[in-house]
Amino acid sequence: MMSASRLAGTLIPAMAFLSCVRPESWEPCVEVVPNITYQCMELNFYKIPDNLPFSTKNLDLSFNPLRHLGSYSFFSFPELQVLDLSRCEIQTIEDGAYQSLSHLSTLILTGNPIQSLALGAFSGLSSLQKLVAVETNLASLENFPIGHLKTLKELNVAHNLIQSFKLPEYFSNLTNLEHLDLSSNKIQSIYCTDLRVLHQMPLLNLSLDLSLNPMNFIQPGAFKEIRLHKLTLRNNFDSLNVMKTCIQGLAGLEVHRLVLGEFRNEGNLEKFDKSALEGLCNLTIEEFRLAYLDYYLDDIIDLFNCLTNVSSFSLVSVTIKSVKDFSYNFGWQHLELVNCKFGQFPTLKLKSLKRLTFTSNKGGNAFSEVDLPSLEFLDLSRNGLSFKGCCSQSDFGTTSLKYLDLSFNGVITMSSNFLGLEQLEHLDFQHSNLKQMSEFSVFLSLRNLIYLDISHTHTRVAFNGIFNGLSSLEVLKMAGNSFQENFLPDIFTELRNLTFLDLSQCQLEQLSPTAFNSLSSLQVLNMSHNNFFSLDTFPYKCLNSLQVLDYSLNHIMTSKKQELQHFPSSLAFLNLTQNDFACTCEHQSFLQWIKDQRQLLVEVERMECATPSDKQGMPVLSLNITCQMNKTIIGVSVLSVLVVSVVAVLVYKFYFHLMLLAGCIKYGRGENIYDAFVIYSSQDEDWVRNELVKNLEEGVPPFQLCLHYRDFIPGVAIAANIIHEGFHKSRKVIVVVSQHFIQSRWCIFEYEIAQTWQFLSSRAGIIFIVLQKVEKTLLRRQVELYRLLSRNTYLEWEDSVLGRHIFWRRLRKALLDGKSWNPEGTVGTGCNWQEATSI
């Protein structure tokens, strides 16, 4: 066994090493946005990590045992904008702890048991806009050192131990403050002196939340001549009398929005009546909301006598036993009744009302006509209402309506095509039960409608003119309905401005090839949750703006006729997930198309085979099908490839010979311009010019020669000139053989073409002139030329008087063969397939 001394000698250095390793190196922070946002929550850090980039802007250090923040704790993060230090067990914050964070806009200190807060704790935060100090053991605003934070807009000190509502003098420096949350503190009384700073330096945009404070007294005049944007008092009063007294203490307050009431399941009041709100007559209120009063209110109209002139009135979760009527005496422009309990649908006669929100209410299932001549916005959703007849101007008492939401209601019988409601722009019927939708053109009058939702309305489309009149419609949602014979006909012919169309869950199996032809502006099309068995791309060829096409959750096995070329080029996202792909050889081209289009397909990795059974559940991308083809097909295919290859090689090799053949066929009976086409090396051009041309063209009879330096057409390929200007327009060919000729590729090329020319035209002749002795070893390299010179008569140039005489006599005789000559000129005989020419 290891001795105790040796064990200690091993453990002590190991423990020393481990103590030096920082925990932040063991548990790295999560990089949410590279170099910008890092989440270091619950990593057991006891100090600020220094292994993050200087460019970090958003840092979450919540739930780490930091306990103490010293000066310049965040010196390494000069670009920081959002810092979350929630529940870090921080007890002490020293002077300059946030120094250097000049860009920080949000600081969250929630849930820290702060015991020592230095006067300069928040120094350096020159851009701070939001400070959250919830549950920080704060006992007073007086000692909270934030008076220098002139950019502060939101201060949240809820759930603390603050007992006095007195706003310190430094609030006069917080000129940008818009929201002060003092909810869930210990404030019981408000005195005039508490709000002195608001008299001296009014904060006109300030929203003040005093909810969940045990209020029992507000000194009359405390809020006199004070202007607030919003005041919230919920769950503040334990009795009706206290509530009445405190509301009277608000006399003289001018507030844009006042919120009174309680929270769900947290009510303190035992009863509530109209006297509670009598003090509101002494306030100037623009918008009023009363929330969560679970009491049966008998005379609701009398309850709000002091609120007749507010512009917006809202009741949320209030139980109302009876309502006489909302009459013309109220000057409200916006009325909101949400989640309330009514005995019956209220009678509404409000001349100035522009917006009515009546949603999620209970009781009064039958809709009764209203008289709202100025109404522009009407939300009657989620009430279970039934409409015996809909919809026209007489139902709502207005011709100004632009927004109508009747979703999540009961049976709605369509008996009118919106006469008098031609200004409608938004119409929502989703999850209501529509009757008589396919009996006539319901929407014929709605030429200004932009948004229409008839999803899950039990509509069965059997009339092609159902959407006639909707010429301005941009969004159409009709999911969860059905079509006659599960076939989509041409019902969108007038919807030329449509950009969004939802046809999901409509049990569709087929669609007309021209169903979408008029939708050139369509960008999003949802065809998911239907019963299509193949992907037919033809109907989408006219959708030039389409970007998103969803065909998920159908029964697609393959593409129709394996044709996929009709998808518009604008398409960016195609969803084919959760379909019944057939992974067989028969559909191999479609499966390969899926692999090729993986950039276009959404969640392509989720596309799996459904058949055959041995490949069920296998991702299409990982599929590798080996298809056995018929041996005959393989043989024919291979033979075809070989034949095509051989033909291509022969055409390539004998291209110019074929060109010559084509020329002979074309010019076969034409007239020759030249007596001979001269083939020679450019090195022998002096002899050709001084001897050959001079003696033949200036002699008697004269002969016309074709020479490349003189007679070839500029700008035409050399090979084309040789064939068209040389061979096709000449009776004979003169070949000037020399060592230079043998070594020239162009000369050999011309000679080979000349052989083909002689073969094709039986009247043609080749005259060989050996200009100088040629080495036999060099001549043997050109086998055909060597063989011809060995078997045929040729002319040999001799530079002597007798040799010249014999040379020119023999050459003229060869050229005269087949030539008609008279003193007036020279005329060729033309192509003659019966004549033969020889030397």
UniProtKB/Swiss-Prot annotation:
Domain TIR: 672-815
Cytoplasmic side stretches: 653-839
First and last residue of the signal peptide: 1-23
UniProt-listed InterPro entries: Cys-rich_flank_reg_C, Leu-rich_rpt, Leu-rich_rpt_4, Leu-rich_rpt_typical-subtyp, LRR_dom_sf, TIR_dom, Toll-like_receptor, Toll_tir_struct_dom_sf
One Pfam family in the UniProt entry: TIR
Residues the record marks as carrying a glycan: N35, N173, N205, N282, N309, N497, N526, N575, N624, N630
LRR repeat positions: 55-76, 79-100, 103-124, 127-148, 151-172, 176-199, 205-225, 227-247, 331-351, 352-373, 374-394, 400-422, 423-444, 448-456, 472-495, 497-518, 521-542, 545-565
Gene Ontology terms: biological process: defense response to Gram-negative bacterium; detection of lipopolysaccharide; inflammatory response; innate immune response; macrophage activation; MyD88-dependent toll-like receptor signaling pathway; positive regulation of interleukin-1 beta production; positive regulation of NLRP3 inflammasome complex assembly
Segments passing through the bilayer: 632-652
Principal localisation: membrane
GO molecular function: lipopolysaccharide binding; lipopolysaccharide immune receptor activity; NAD+ nucleosidase activity, cyclic ADP-ribose generating; transmembrane signaling receptor activity
Domain LRRCT positions: 579-629
Keywords: Cell membrane, Cell projection, Disulfide bond, Endosome, Glycoprotein, Immunity, Inflammatory response, Innate immunity, Leucine-rich repeat, Membrane, NAD, Receptor, Repeat, Signal, Transmembrane, Transmembrane helix, Ubl conjugation
Subcellular location: Cell membrane; Early endosome; Cell projection, Ruffle
Stretches assigned to the Extracellular side: 24-631
Membrane topology recorded in Swiss-Prot or TrEMBL: Single-pass type I membrane protein
GO cellular component terms listed in the entry, alphabetical order: early endosome; lipopolysaccharide receptor complex; plasma membrane; ruffle
Classification via SMART domains: LRR_SD22 (SM00365), LRR_TYP (SM00369), LRRCT (SM00082), TIR (SM00255)
PTM entry text: Phosphorylated on tyrosine residues by LYN after binding lipopolysaccharide. Ubiquitinated by RNF128 via 'Lys-28'-linked polyubiquitin chains, leading to proteasomal degradation.
Record's keyword annotation contains Ubl conjugation: yes
Stored PANTHER family: TOLL-LIKE RECEPTOR, TOLL-LIKE RECEPTOR 4
Domain notes: The TIR domain mediates interaction with NOX4.
Quaternary assembly: Belongs to the lipopolysaccharide (LPS) receptor, a multi-protein complex containing at least CD14, LY96 and TLR4. Binding to bacterial LPS leads to homodimerization. Interacts with LY96 via the extracellular domain. Interacts with MYD88 and TIRAP via their respective TIR domains. Interacts with NOX4. Interacts with CNPY3 and HSP90B1; this interaction is required for proper folding in the endoplasmic reticulum. Interacts with MAP3K21; this interaction leads to negative regulation of TLR4 signaling.
Entry similarity comment: Belongs to the Toll-like receptor family.
Function in brief: Transmembrane receptor that functions as a pattern recognition receptor recognizing pathogen- and damage-associated molecular patterns (PAMPs and DAMPs) to induce innate immune responses via downstream signaling pathways. At the plasma membrane, cooperates with LY96 to mediate the innate immune response to bacterial lipopolysaccharide (LPS). Also involved in LPS-independent inflammatory responses triggered by free fatty acids, such as palmitate, and Ni(2+). Mechanistically, acts via MYD88, TIRAP and TRAF6, leading to NF-kappa-B activation, cytokine secretion and the inflammatory response.
Protein name: Toll-like receptor 4
UniProt source species: Pan paniscus
